[in-house]
């Protein structure tokens, strides 16, 4: 009975189109749909570097240096969009990537001074890119401002063919906000715990049909959960785009970030994670020296992106970027808890670093067909120069401090 029942349904389904075919043909009126993929003339929404409507990006340049649909790339690429960062209220790049598979974002805890991710088990501090250019640093890592970026893209797995020497775990590319040839104004103010006050703005406009501009800025005064550890920042990122015709585009971008973020120093295990005969050590305890410990950094970028399409088959692109990091740091770090379970040994650390980096990337993209197959080929030549000046001093001694009755100002430091 079950077999007959299935055959009867199949027969009925075959008969339906035959019955419909026998009816008279009805001609419907023509409907014309008009629209544009961008936001006005020269719009950038939905492109590989422009804003994304929602959480799901469809295009990327990180995986191939060509604007390519994500679904067509063999690599594993995760994209965190501006909308997702805003809805989650992220405060740093680590929080933005917390839900990205294969990425450990804060292996040293929430240290406001720097961002030190791990991708697929490999340290990726030296695999950070800004607009496709590698961020070069030594000791002076940096905590980038997420509000200044349109998207954060993680390419997992080796990428040396496109980007040169790097960690096998993958890279993180931070894509800066650019002009969109639309008018918008966004001004926000935030108040949070730990005396956190933030003011930020994102303003864009159109000067004429060929020129668009954008300015992103942020100012922050903030303490942290640990006493005497501040997390202050000033950030500015201007940009301007010039598009004289449909085939030519030139975008000039810059950014300047000043951070005054102190080191959390650290706390002993006995009294925090484990028990201590003298009681619990509060997470707000500061074991450094407020009048000695200091950390500040200046970080700036300036660069451009130029593209010209000669015809439907050939396009030339040239991107260049200069970055400068000036990092100054001195600190008494926690070096161990004594056998008495309350005396904390401390050691001095003084670091000064100045890094200058310049890179230029030339690309020629060609499109051609062989029979029914369509091809896109990329030929490129890039140049990079890095200069690093660094001084480090770990010599000297410092007086210990009582973890349960700290007295600051008793500093003995000799270098």
Locations of regions flagged by a protein language model:
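Short acidic/polar hinge/loop motifs at secondary-structure boundaries
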Residues: 105, 116, 133-156, 175-176
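Transmembrane beta-barrel strands of outer-membrane/channel proteins
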Residues: 187-191, 215-219, 252-258, 318-324, ...
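Outer-membrane beta-barrel channels and translocator barrels
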Residues: 208-210, 243-247, 311-313, 365, ...
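Non-catalytic regulatory/gating segments with a bias toward low-complexity or hydrophobic composition
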Residues: 77, 85, 97, 152-157, ...
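Acidic/polar loop-and-plug regions of large Gram-negative outer-membrane beta-barrel proteins
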Residues: 220-224, 234-309, 313, 324-355, ...
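Short, acidic, small-residue-rich periplasmic hinge/interaction motif at the N-terminus
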Residues: 22-83
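Extracytoplasmic beta-strand/coil segments of soluble accessory domains associated
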Residues: 55-78, 82, 88, 94-134, ...
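Outer-membrane beta-barrel translocator/receptor signature
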Residues: 147-150, 161-238, 244-248, 300
